[in-house]
């Protein structure tokens, strides 16, 4: 990557100052199972493009993709710069014992803490792309059918197994009554009268996740859906109402096609509710009032934000993607992926001569040369000089 020149002050006009991007070295990528190709290969390409060598650990949960990656990648890539390691938590733990130059992990906050703890042993820098409970506020002035279309699409996409999917809706009881029939209409239009047979609705990744999600169906009251089929690992697109903050469905990231609705009376109450929780990976607000959307944006914190829209921003390579606080640290996508896997090294190349010009920097310092230094360095009052 070409170096990036940077501006200088008067005393450095003869110097060359630039940012040199160099590879970290050996990078460990621990990939997730929900989008096992995209969330593996995007990172692999970024790390290799930055010049690093990669140890790639695909998720053992998406077994088919794990096997394909292990078999196909060595056929097309130089094996001296990467390795694919198969296995489960034990193998991942063994990898984390080694001295690495960078770790990129995508997964749950619980495992993210394990990864970060292991990284501290060698002070290894990390990017953690974690999850969270993503709120979706719906204002009373919204058209319920428009909201239903957009929320149902990005809630049930990939059977809800998406880290930026809405985890719950916040709205007034009045909006809930208008929203429920609209959601039912949308679900039928998207997936038909028998969603289980729809080619447009995904199923749950494995039995463990299925059992976890089916247990959540017992929370609150099922207003839409609620059906399940263990042999098919099918959970119907579901909406829960009368949901309390203390219930299990509100205590963990759902990561499935279940949408709880929590009642609030105002945008202020919604914001207070959101700010009582950990910072989410994404936050959504629907309102015909730009003031309401801006309030939600300005008075909360999240990895990303969508006003009157879902997670379509993740398709853009021009903006970074990442969490904040409990939902992660670091960023990637597009050039940001390259930058994540690069050490940004500040470089200054000065002439070997011209010593007379440098003497102004040396002690003893008089009032005159201090004034000259301040003038030559500009108004950088927070620098050493």
From Swiss-Prot:
Active site positions: 129, 163
Annotated catalysed reactions: an aldehyde + NAD(+) + H2O = a carboxylate + NADH + 2 H(+); a long-chain fatty aldehyde + NAD(+) + H2O = a long-chain fatty acid + NADH + 2 H(+); a medium-chain fatty aldehyde + NAD(+) + H2O = a medium-chain fatty acid + NADH + 2 H(+); hexadecanoate + NADH + 2 H(+) = hexadecanal + NAD(+) + H2O
Residues bearing PTM Cysteine methyl ester: 382
Lipidated positions per record (S-geranylgeranyl cysteine): 382
Transmembrane segments: none
Residues that coordinate or bind NAD(+): 107-112
GO cellular component, one term: membrane
Pfam family, one: Aldedh
Modification after translation, per record: Geranylgeranylation is important for localization to lipid droplets and enzyme activity.
Record propeptide residues: 383-385
Subcellular location field: Lipid droplet
Record carries keyword Kinase: no
GO BP, one annotated term: alcohol metabolic process
Family per similarity comment: Belongs to the aldehyde dehydrogenase family.
Reported function: Oxidizes medium and long chain fatty aldehydes in lipid droplets into non-toxic fatty acids.
Protein name: Aldehyde dehydrogenase family 3 member B2
Protein's organism: Homo sapiens (Human)
């Amino acid at each position: 990557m070409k170096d990036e020149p940077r501006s200088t002050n008067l005393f450095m006009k003869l110097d060359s100052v630039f940012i040199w991007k160099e590879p970290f070295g050996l990078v460990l990528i621990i990939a997730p199972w929900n989008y096992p190709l995209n969330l593996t290969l995007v990172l692999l390409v970024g790390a290799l493009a930055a010049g690093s060598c990669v140890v790639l650990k695909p998720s053992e949960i998406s077994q088919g993709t794990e096997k394909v990656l292990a078999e196909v990648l060595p056929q097309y890539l130089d094996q001296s710069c990467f390795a694919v390691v198969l296995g489960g938590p034990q193998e991942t733990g063994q990898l984390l014992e080694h001295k690495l130059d960078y770790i990129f992990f995508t997964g749950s906050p619980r495992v993210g803490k394990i990864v970060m703890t292991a990284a501290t042993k060698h002070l290894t820098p990390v990017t953690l792309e974690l999850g969270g409970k993503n709120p979706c506020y719906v204002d009373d002035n919204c058209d319920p059918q428009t909201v239903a279309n957009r929320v149902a699409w990005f809630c049930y996409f990939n059977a809800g197994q998406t880290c930026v999917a809405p985890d719950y809706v916040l709205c007034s009881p009045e909006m809930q009554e208008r929203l429920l029939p609209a959601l039912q209409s949308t679900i039928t239009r998207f997936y038909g009268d028998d969603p289980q047979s729809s080619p447009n609705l995904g199923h749950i990744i494995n039995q463990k996740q299925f059992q976890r999600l089916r247990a959540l169906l017992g929370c609150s009251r099922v207003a839409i859906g609620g059906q399940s089929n263990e042999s098919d690992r099918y959970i119907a697109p579901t909406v829960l109402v009368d949901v309390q903050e203390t219930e299990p469905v509100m205590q963990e990231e759902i990561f499935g096609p279940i949408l709880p609705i929590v009642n609030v009376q105002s945008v202020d109450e919604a914001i207070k509710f959101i700010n009582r929780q950990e910072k989410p990976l994404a936050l959504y607000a629907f309102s015909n009032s730009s003031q309401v959307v801006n309030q939600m944006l300005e008075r909360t914190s999240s990895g990303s934000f969508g006003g009157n829209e879902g997670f379509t921003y993740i398709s853009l390579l021009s903006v970074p993607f990442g969490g904040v606080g409990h939902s992660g640290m670091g960023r990637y996508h597009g050039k940001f992926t390259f930058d994540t896997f690069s050490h940004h090294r500040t470089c200054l190349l000065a002439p070997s001569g011209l010593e007379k010009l440098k003497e102004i920097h040396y002690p003893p310092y008089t009032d005159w040369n201090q004034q000259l230094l301040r003038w030559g360095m500009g108004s950088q009052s927070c620098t050493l000089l």
